[in-house]
């Protein structure tokens, strides 16, 4: 019984490397809206028709060794998700040690991509994400962007930081790239 409890605890307190960023400005403590700077990162991504729901499994296979180097790669946070009317896209951030040496994917349709450094606005929310929550917090973020005079570069993405089996203190964010703010180097 003690072994089972220790195993269960290890799952719930497991720490993952998290994509680094710098908070440049906080806009709303209640809604946890922040302007951030993200340095370049290496990601592995896959896009599929909305009806198909295998993106996470395909990416998990990649980090589990289904890559050209047959190398296991540590899970990181966050997981990026976005969608259009026809497609859904998911991306894993790779550990920083793979910035220049990430193994090539074996799966067709999966791509390695190095992101450019950039400025992003984020809003944080808890619980499990749903279409309704994503729409609600995306609208709150858009309102702040408009009131603060920021222009966006691209569509928002949902970021998830927690495993599906984590039931409390969950962290999700909506993130959208913005044009470089005045006075930022």
Q: Which residues are covered by each model-predicted region?
A:
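A solvent-exposed interaction/effector surface
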Residues: 2-185
